[in-house]
Amino acid sequence: MPATWGDRFQCRHQPRHQCQCHPQMAAALSRPARSKWACRQCETLTQAPVPAQVIDKGIPTAGLLAHVMVAKFADHLPLYRQEKIFGRAGLAIARSTLARWVGQTGVRLQPLVDALREAVLKQGVIHADETPVQMLAPGEKKTHRAYVWAYSSTPFSALNAVVYDFSPSRAGEHARNFLGDWNGKLVCDDFAGYKAGFEQGITEIGCMAHARRKFFDLHVANKSQLAEQALHSIGGLYEIERQARDMSNEDRWRIRQELAVPISKTLHEWMLAQRDLVPNGSATAKALDYSLKRWVALTRYLDDGAVPIDNNQVENQIRPWALGRSNWLFAGSLRSGKRAAAIMSLIQSARMNGHDPYAYLKDVLTRLPTQRASEIGRLLPHQWVPA
């Protein structure tokens, strides 16, 4: 008959080396013990299994991996700097090792990012923007311009999420591949890469902030009275948005119809009249033309309380990439760029939901190895509850 635990005695204590990170930014070598037990009757040895890890049989704990990811993608510390910081703490961790950990962690987190993408594409209105990132060309020592595309929920949505998509170029096919058969309302700038989607059923929503910026730059350049008048009228539209920010979509639509529609109609008529008075090719004509050519898209927000007035929501989520590229300079490959986009998607979405990125990632990386695929959604930033 099989022996019970009462018939066994501990015969050996086997330490298992792991590298962990303490809150004080000190890394240390921990030795979680795995005891061996022997049966007094049959002398059979039994040992506790190794706890499941994100990196199978790897030495970094979930806390250390979370620290490396947050330091690189939230605090913008390139890996060579982290290597030096760990060195001062008494740990010799090569940047090549850190890079391998980043890649392996990104792979393990990809199912979460795929689920996050599905959640974003269930929204009827989403934001889109893109920004350049240098990428090392395969087999060469020089870089070329790649792009990160950002797709986020709106400030009026119950979902707080952003998903980044790293691509080798700014070709519109990358946006089409990400959006798939989604055909909602897309808030974006006037980039031609989105045009094919508009022809296939996506509704274009213009960005009033871009229109305003044209007049702002004109006013800064020559103190234009025309620009000042345009800024005053657009400012009136934004004041209404501030009043309606915390309203329901239906109430926001009502106040827009009552207050914003008359302002927008007056502004449009004024712009048309002013355009007849200025010469083609002038800075003033260009500022007016930007708004007049996009007026339908710029004012669609007036007819739907769920649609924002501008694209600032996603532009704020693009900013971390601008900060990051000034520190880590470039992506080492297309694959590493995609891994970075995956990790950044979760970190920024965690921030949007008010979570500490380190606490979120540490918990997710701890639970992920044993999480059922059918319950992966519980680890998404907008549904996450600490264990």
Briefly describe each language-model feature range:
Residues 1-35, 40:
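Residue-centric detector for conserved, function-critical "anchor" positions
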Residues 32-387:
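Catalytic center-proximal scaffold of phosphoryl-transfer enzymes
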